[in-house]
Amino acid sequence: MSFLRSFARNKDISKVGRRGIHCMQKLCAEKISPDSLEKAQNRVIDAALTLVRENTGLRKNLCHSLGGAVATSTLLGVPLGHNSSFLEGPAFAPPFIREGIWCGSANSTTEEGKDLKDLRIMVDVGDIPIQEMRDCGIGDERLMKVVSDSVKLVMEEDPLRPLILGGDPSISYPVVRAISEKLGGPVDVLHFDAHPDLYDEFEGNYYSHASSFARIMEGGYARRLLQVGIRSINKEGREQAKKFGVEQFEMRHFSKDRPFLENLNLGEGAKGVYISIDVDCLDPGYAVGVSHYESGGLSFRDVMNMLQNLKGDIVGGDVVEYNPQREPPDRMTAMVAAKFVRELAAKMSK
């Protein structure tokens, strides 16, 4: 019975995720002129960016009023799930992650002793209204630009640094692109994932969640890409890694690679370090609320050891692929994703 309920929920999600497609078809059927439609879409995009700009400016002013912050982690939700090839539930993740961050079952202090209630450590500027833009028929190329522009708006407000709540992994591409363009050069990327996400295209989708790191590498936005937790990879994934010079650390060799990975020093000669955490890097026993189950993954403490021991200036990060429709009502995986956000926020801030 629980399977049937889950199946029904996922069918509902699929309908919601395709709302933008249906809306575009309806707009075309009504014979609205392309010029009028584009003008209306541009106004919606301007409104979305204005929302991010005003929220970001307010949080910057609050940080400045307290004084002393060099880098403040800034949560920005990107509720996008339609580029997933399987389930689109990650579009609904940001509110559940936020609830996990602030729920009463844990205090606001991170493992290294930083209090997240201190606005110099972490602020939240809300979500980009992705679905509202899709409902206006705005396609992926323009959506990705809105994500990039939103990240740049965050970075314009010193000392704010972007920490993104996904969303499916396709969002990593426009975020890393924005950071690299804003800083004037490539960053080093530490990517935790069960999958390399290096397909040139997947099922004909240039912006697929399975292609995000191919887009990053071909754009020259990453100097080094280290992928940790890999255990679902085919011939194309390995060929693409070789083509782009990606350093892949597969789970079958993790015990041998652990000493190196727990003592990383990244970012020297680059514009900083970007951390991308796909929740399915973890073994499903630690995180059932993901779209793709791959047994034999990392433990939560494995990831924390690598993150907490990392040396380098972290200029941005994301936590993606949490799917609230794939777990029981206790939302345990939301707490896992929230813990990733909390500890990454602490690591980024200074």
From Swiss-Prot:
The keyword Hydrolase applies. Keywords: Arginine metabolism, Hydrolase, Manganese, Metal-binding. Transmembrane segments: none annotated. It comes from the Eukaryota. The keyword Nucleotidyltransferase does not apply. Pfam families: Arginase (PF00491). Its cofactor is Mn(2+). Mn(2+) 2 binds at D193, H195, D278, D280. It catalyses: L-arginine + H2O = urea + L-ornithine. One of its GO terms (molecular function) is agmatinase activity. GO terms for biological process: putrescine biosynthetic process from arginine, via agmatine; urea cycle. Its EC number is 3.5.3.1. Belongs to the arginase family. This is Arginase. It comes from Glycine max. The lineage of its organism: Eukaryota, Viridiplantae, Streptophyta, Embryophyta, Tracheophyta. The gene is AG1.
